[in-house]
């Protein structure tokens, strides 16, 4: 039932779109007060890394948040001075945020900072830590459409059509 009450249906379409167009997609899964929360993340926001088994186990995500959203998410007291000032004067001014999600090594679990998967948020300009937590298991699903053995990122079907598209564009320039 928790799955049915979630926003999965809205987010899975974005995931499939990114997967077919770019060859790699990312879906973040978290819990909030209402239950499961899914969030498709654009491939331009993330960098991924694989473990020895070829599974994605590390994601670095760079994105923007308003000063208001940062205060709601991390607490005003945890923001750098520049974000605190913006919260007072221009709460909708955007700031860069980096979210790092990676395995803690040999951690067997626990609570918060002792969980098996680390989750750290930093302010993108000041590099001040905004918040740290963790997950019991890796919270990103990162499907790749077609991947060869030496690549981390996937290839999409659109990459096969790209040379033909470029040729047709050139042909239309010449005939116009």
Which residues fall in each region the model found?
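Extended alpha-helical, oligomerization-prone segments that build pores/tubes and scaffolds
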Residues: 1-176
């Amino acid at each position: 039932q928790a799955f049915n009450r979630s926003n999965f249906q809205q987010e899975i379409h974005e995931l499939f779109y990114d997967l077919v167009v770019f060859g790699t997609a990312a879906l973040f899964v978290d819990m909030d007060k209402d239950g499961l929360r899914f969030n498709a993340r654009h491939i331009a926001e993330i960098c991924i890394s694989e473990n020895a088994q070829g599974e994605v186990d590390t994601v670095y995500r760079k994105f923007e948040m308003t000063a208001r959203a940062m205060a709601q998410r991390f607490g005003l007291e945890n923001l750098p001075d520049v974000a605190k000032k913006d919260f007072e004067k221009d709460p909708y001014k955007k700031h860069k945020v980096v979210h790092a999600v990676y395995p803690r090594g040999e951690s067997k679990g626990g609570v918060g900072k002792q969980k098996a998967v680390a989750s750290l948020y930093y302010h993108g300009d000041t590099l001040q830590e905004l918040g740290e937590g963790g997950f019991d298991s890796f919270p990103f699903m990162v499907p790749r459409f077609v991947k060869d053995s030496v690549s981390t990122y996937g290839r999409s079907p659109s990459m096969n059509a790209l040379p033909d598209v470029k040729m047709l564009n050139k042909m239309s320039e010449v005939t116009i």
